């Protein structure tokens, strides 16, 4: 059976599989998932799969954990969350009941060797945003393997925070930009949002449209009217980044890739279409 590699939380659940199904999955090296129930004093994650106990020793909780490259916090935060793994074997406890041995690290190594290592800059892959920092968003690119989407790779137009473009748990498509010195992917999405000319073609001088304030400077206010398209309006000190406004398109200058705007109305509460609100 050909293994399909996905982001964590998108594998077949092992919770209600029968012992026979679990044996087959183990033999086929199928990646499954289950919710981690605890991180105990023995530094192992505990699960229940198919009505039986299962454990994941710390060294098997992530690729690199065995060499000390993974901190405890990265493992204990899996508690209460779906976690992917392959079944490495089965033991018995003191009462004779089965206890499955699981490895997320092996699932990640398989994902790297058979999927991620075959990708090159320019390839597009599905990702899930796992957490956001001021400098960018970390994304799961497969089996919980993390890659950075820097804030400057999220948009051509100015944004003050990665949260202006993405949210935790959001499924997005990213382009592989390059690899960092540790071999991890660096991602970008701005190329998928269209060029300046492609976005500007949807607008006409004289229109009044809805936009989002992205930056307020002394010399003017930058308003985004499409995910990769922003124009400059007059400076308005009472506006704040993230606020919705309607703007009149005064001029479009393709040769300079600039749009001149005039703020018509500002809004305190306004539900925006997904294309602008992310």
Model-derived regions, located:
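A cross-kingdom feature marking solvent-exposed beta-strand/loop segments within repeated
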Residues: 56-76, 110-113, 146-165, 195, ...
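Structural detector for short beta-strands of small beta-barrel domains
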Residues: 27-42, 83-89, 121-133, 174, ...
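Conserved small/polar residues in nucleotide/adenosyl-binding loops
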Residues: 268-274
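Solenoidal tandem-repeat scaffolds enriched in leucines and small polar residues
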Residues: 130, 136-188
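Hydrophobic, ordered structural segments
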Residues: 75-112, 124, 131-136, 142-146, ...
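Short boundary/loop segments of OB/S1/cold-shock single-stranded nucleic-acid-binding domains
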Residues: 8-29, 69-73, 104-121, 162, ...
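Short aromatic-glycine-enriched beta-strand elements
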Residues: 42-46, 135-139, 185, 219-222
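Charged, low-complexity terminal tails
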Residues: 1-90
């Amino acid at each position: 059976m050909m293994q399909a590699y996905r982001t964590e939380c998108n594998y077949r659940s092992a919770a209600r599989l029968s012992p026979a199904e679990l044996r087959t999955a183990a033999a086929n090296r199928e990646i499954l998932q289950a919710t981690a129930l605890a991180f105990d004093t023995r530094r192992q994650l505990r699960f229940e799969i198919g009505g039986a106990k299962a454990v994941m020793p710390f060294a098997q909780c992530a690729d690199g954990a065995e060499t000390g490259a993974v901190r405890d916090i990265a493992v204990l935060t899996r508690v209460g969350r779906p976690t992917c793994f392959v079944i490495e074997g089965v033991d018995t406890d003191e009462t004779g009941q089965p206890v499955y041995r699981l490895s997320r690290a092996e699932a990640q190594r398989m994902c790297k060797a058979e999927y991620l290592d075959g990708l090159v800059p320019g390839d597009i892959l599905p990702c899930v945003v796992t957490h956001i920092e001021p400098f960018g968003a970390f994304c799961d690119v497969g089996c919980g393997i993390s890659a950075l989407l820097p804030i400057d790779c999220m948009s051509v137009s100015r944004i003050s925070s990665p949260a202006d473009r993405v949210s935790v748990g959001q499924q997005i498509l990213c382009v592989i930009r390059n690899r960092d010195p540790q071999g991890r992917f660096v991602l970008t999405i701005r190329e998928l949002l269209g060029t300046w000319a492609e976005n500007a073609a949807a607008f006409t001088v004289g229109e009044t449209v809805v936009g989002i304030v992205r930056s307020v400077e002394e010399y003017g206010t930058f308003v985004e009217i499409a995910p990769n398209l922003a124009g400059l309006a007059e400076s308005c000190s009472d506006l704040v980044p993230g606020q919705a406004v309607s703007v009149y398109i005064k001029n479009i200058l393709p040769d300079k890739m600039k749009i001149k705007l005039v703020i018509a109305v500002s809004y305190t509460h306004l539900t925006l279409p997904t294309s602008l609100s992310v």
